[in-house]
Amino acid sequence: MASSLSRLVLPFVPLLVVAGVGPAGALPLQVQPHDPLDRSCPGCDLRQADFRQAHLIGSDFRGSDLRGADLREANLEGADLTGALLEGADLRGANLTNAELSGVDLRNADLREAQVINAYAPNVRTSGMRYAGASLFGSNLIIGGGD
């Protein structure tokens, strides 16, 4: 009887798990979404990417092409953006605290209301960059840059 019952039920177990049905007292299945970038994507072509409100703490985007990317309110704390192309990127309200911004191209980027605290940023290209209301405390974003 038990073996015939298991032959009847076993083919439907995957469906029961997906539907959230399980044996009494069983814990619900917890699946974490897979991060395709795994917070590391040096040299990637991410033009026009949508990273709004993304948690990218400590990400590695060295040399990546993020031109025109939407990074509004993204958390890039401690991220390495060395040599990244962020021309025309929308970084309004983004957190770039302690980020590595050496040689970053921020021409025509929008950093209004962004937190750029203690960021290391020599040789940054800043022509046309908007930064009204941005917190630049402890950063050399403007001093270390230019075209």
Q: Predicted regions span which residues?
A:
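Short helix-capping/turn motifs at alpha-helix boundaries
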Residues: 1, 18-21
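Bacterial N-terminal signal peptides that target proteins for export
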Residues: 1-11
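Bacterial N-terminal signal peptides
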Residues: 11-19
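Tandem repeat scaffolds
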Residues: 22-147
